[in-house]
Amino acid sequence: MEFVTALVNLQEESSCPICLEYLKDPVTINCGHNFCRSCLSVSWKDLDDTFPCPVCRFCFPYKSFRRNPQLRNLTEIAKQLQIRRSKRKRQKENAMCEKHNQFLTLFCVKDLEILCTQCSFSTKHQKHYICPIKKAASYHREILEGSLEPLRNNIERVEKVIILQGSKSVELKKKVEYKREEINSEFEQIRLFLQNEQEMILRQIQDEEMNILAKLNENLVELSDYVSTLKHLLREVEGKSVQSNLELLTQAKSMHHKYQNLKCPELFSFRLTKYGFSLPPQYSGLDRIIKPFQVDVILDLNTAHPQLLVSEDRKAVRYERKKRNICYDPRRFYVCPAVLGSQRFSSGRHYWEVEVGNKPKWILGVCQDCLLRNWQDQPSVLGGFWAIGRYMKSGYVASGPKTTQLLPVVKPSKIGIFLDYELGDLSFYNMNDRSILYTFNDCFTEAVWPYFYTGTDSEPLKICSVSDSER
């Protein structure tokens, strides 16, 4: 009954609402109803302004329909199912050979076909083993009965597997909970460590402030005393100046001696201590936080300055004095020895590392495509550029909307770069002591490319691959 109901429903869905026959070349209109193409064309034949659906009457401003090959295939399936069902029904009711109109009493073992007597003599079944239906049915019934036990065993085995797999969900939940607690604990340790570091550094700054303030006040007292002495001397000099010549010259030696022995206290100057910290290895969350976003950056040959030599794997670049003859490209750097990465970033978070070694000059960062290609050095006053670099005269500098002097505690030989496009953050890490060098907070309005400036020495810049960075 369920098969019959399903077949009836399939036939209804495969019928055209206009001609009530099986759909021929079915088409679908925008409201979702289906029709024969010819029926819909006739229905809309004399219409100009509006074209209503023949079923729901929803009107469209223009003729619009699309062919539905999937529905055409389903319609053909519905036809075949109806034909087969009718054929089976007749066979079941009559058990007669449709070809010879004789009772079906025999069975071809090789072809697995039910035959009448006349069919068994046909050339198709010559030399085939043919037996009575009763015997063939008994044989196949034994085969089916023999397969019952293996089927039951298979069901039992799979049910045990289901129970086992079900228990794995409990195991998974426990492991996930353990991992969650482990991560929470680790990050709590990092948070506490950072909090303690912050409090300690703030105390040090406060102590230093009080110490400097005390010395500054002491210096102010010395200067005030010096001013008082000068004022007293001034009054004394003014009194001596009106004395007689003899009295003035008698005391001239002591006055000169007193004036010459006056010394102005040195001005007190101060410089705050450079404070910083780096996460110890046991608390270092840097890998866990940013390494999952690591990308394999490769260099774009079409942007490389003519005097830059890019390695075969496009992971390293160095400057050479010999200038190569290469095709012009508007995105190529022709004045400064620079090159871009081949992958642009317009969303998401990305991390890559670059070995700078002991190069005397280098610049790393990101830039927008609007960056000018004809400037001599780093474009500190231009927009669309965020980078840090080392300069032979000015040391380490962050260049972007403004220029900032950097004072790394440890000289970096490998730089980590982390870009959070949506947040507008670009952070640079000194991978030697795992400290942060600088972070830009901006709003990226266009896609950005990794940027590499080599300087004019022969030492290369090397982009670390993912496998190298994980070591």
Curated annotation (Swiss-Prot):
Zinc finger (RING-type) residue numbers: 16-57
Annotated Zn(2+) binding sites: C97, H100, C119, H125
One of the protein's GO biological processes: innate immune response
Coiled-coil regions listed: 171-223
Limits of the B30.2/SPRY domain: 277-470
InterPro entries linked to this entry: B30.2/SPRY, B30.2/SPRY_sf, Butyrophylin_SPRY, ConA-like_dom_sf, PRY, SPRY/PRY_TRIM60, SPRY_dom, TRIM/RBCC
A single GO molecular function term of this UniProt record: SUMO-ubiquitin ligase activity
Keywords: Coiled coil, Metal-binding, Zinc, Zinc-finger
This protein's record includes keyword Zinc: yes
GO cellular component, one term: cytoplasm
Zinc fingers, B box-type class: 92-133
Primary role: E3 SUMO-protein ligase that mediates SUMOylation of TAB2 leading to inhibition of NF-kappa-B and MAPK pathways by suppressing the TRAF6/TAB2/TAK1 complex.
Family assignment from sequence similarity: Belongs to the TRIM/RBCC family.
UniProt protein name: Tripartite motif-containing protein 60
Organism: Homo sapiens
